[in-house]
Amino acid sequence: MCIRDSLQSEQIRSRIDEFGGKLYLEFGGKIFDDYHASRVLPGFLPDSKMKMLIELKDEAEMIIAINANDIEKSKVRGDIGITYDLDVLRLIDIYSSFGLVVRSVVLTQYNSQPLAKAFSEKLNSLGIDVYRHYAIDNYPTDVKLVVSDDGYGKNDFIKTEKSLVVVTAPGPGSGKMAVSVSYTHLRAH
């Protein structure tokens, strides 16, 4: 563990306390094997994020977001050549192998898509809770609608137990930030 990882972990713990014992952290980019970031960011190692999370594993749980439309289109990760849904299963295995708790997957932009429903059933059979977040018309510009019962209010509330909730995804456009904001909105109401 490098000093930087320990400092980041301490800052996260401080933020957990600052925000009343619960922090939602949206992790963009790769959590491990981030060779691009290690090339362009001085001092950043390919596994810096993972090392920090391992240090926080007793306090953290992972939520993985995946866009239901990406499941339906069989969207493929260009770097490793597998579909986003298969990558969710891979990420669950990898995070779990490092002792990180993964008990939830959120299907974003959900509209009862057939392949998304099948994927939900597969996750349930593996003991993973599945939550649905629905498309919101005029998101994010119609703030009044977004924060109403017909916006974030219609999304499933994600049950969490740990003080640090890390929201991640197989790739961009999966809805990580929307899941984080929706979750904090639902928790407040």
Language-model regions, residue ranges each:
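A short, structured active-site edge motif that brings together acidic residues
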Residues: 134-136
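Glycine-rich phosphate-binding P-loop
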Residues: 165-185
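Conserved small/polar residues in nucleotide/adenosyl-binding loops
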Residues: 1-5, 184-189
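Structural beta-strand/beta-sheet cores of well-ordered domains, especially the beta-sheet scaffolds
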Residues: 21-23, 163, 179
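Short, well-ordered, mixed-charge alpha-helical segments that flank or form enzyme active sites
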Residues: 72-73, 112-115, 138-142, 174-175
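Phosphate-binding P-loop
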Residues: 157-162
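N-terminal pre-Walker A segment at the start of P-loop NTPase domains
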Residues: 138-152
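Long, basic/Gly/Ser/Thr-rich N-terminal segments
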Residues: 4-132
